[in-house]
């Protein structure tokens, strides 16, 4: 599900009105970059996998000035989840120094850096437009094949497409796996859906998909055609 910018801004205003911090999870947002300042977001969290086409090796935490002030005033009782400490580690490296808190996955981090630079050179706006186009085309394909989207019109994310199904083979991903594609089962909505509720998810992340839209859509279409004929 994709939340429009005006929705995010409204949430931010409501949170700020009671002195809170607005934390937005963008791990599955793909290449839909979020303007933190325009949307009033205090903390944005993401990760190298999915939209960044890298290995899961760290957490990405971007903070507004409000969030930074709040973090610096905290005193954590956790070693691993002490955001203030990790912020100090990052600041040490940004200033050309070195600091140690735990052994880091250096090779994976270096690869992540390379992919970020590759994406920057390719163009952040360009890859965002391609994310939108790919999502729209895949959703149109699935609609034509008779699948209904879980997300309503206007809230359909282009990075993860979730559709209803009555076929356990689609939910489990077995039918896609038989055609060489990896999908995922949908997660429970936890809003009193019936016991026979079933969905499946198709992730549209990665430069290899976004930079090859025709190939990506064609591969999915061919797989669906073969499943229909089976």
Predicted regions and their residues:
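Conserved PLP cofactor-binding pocket of PLP-dependent enzymes
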Residues: 179-201
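Active-site C-terminal subdomain of aminotransferase-like
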Residues: 52-140, 144, 208
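Conserved PLP-binding catalytic core of the aspartate aminotransferase-like
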Residues: 148-179
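PLP-dependent enzyme catalytic core of the Aspartate aminotransferase-like
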Residues: 194-230
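Active-site core of PLP-dependent enzymes with the aminotransferase class I/II
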Residues: 1-18, 32-34, 213
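Conserved active-site segment immediately N-terminal to the catalytic lysine
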Residues: 37-49, 59
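General beta-strand structural signal in soluble alpha/beta enzymes
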Residues: 22-26, 44-47, 183-185
């Amino acid at each position: 599900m994709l939340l429009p910018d005006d929705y995010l801004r409204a949430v931010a205003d409501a949170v700020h009105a009671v002195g809170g911090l607005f934390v937005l999870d963008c791990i599955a947002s793909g290449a839909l970059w979020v303007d933190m300042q325009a949307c009033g977001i205090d903390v944005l969290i993401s990760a190298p996998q999915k939209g960044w086409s890298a290995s899961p090796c760290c957490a990405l935490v971007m903070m507004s000035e409000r969030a930074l002030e709040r973090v610096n005033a905290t005193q954590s009782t956790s070693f691993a989840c002490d955001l203030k400490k990790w912020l100090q580690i990052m600041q040490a490296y940004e200033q050309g120094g070195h600091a140690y808190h735990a052994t880091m996955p250096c090779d994976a981090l270096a690869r992540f850096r390379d992919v970020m630079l590759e994406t920057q050179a390719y163009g952040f706006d360009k890859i965002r437009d391609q994310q939108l186009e790919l999502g729209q085309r895949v959703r149109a394909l699935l609609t034509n094949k008779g699948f209904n989207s879980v997300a309503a019109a206007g809230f359909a994310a282009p990075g993860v497409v979730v559709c209803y199904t009555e076929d356990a083979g689609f939910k489990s991903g077995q039918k896609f796996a038989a055609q060489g594609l990896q999908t995922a089962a949908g997660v429970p909505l936890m809003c009193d859906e019936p016991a026979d509720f079933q969905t499946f998810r198709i992730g549209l992340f990665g430069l290899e998909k976004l930079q090859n839209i025709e190939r990506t859509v064609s591969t999915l279409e061919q797989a669906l055609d073969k499943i229909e004929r089976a």
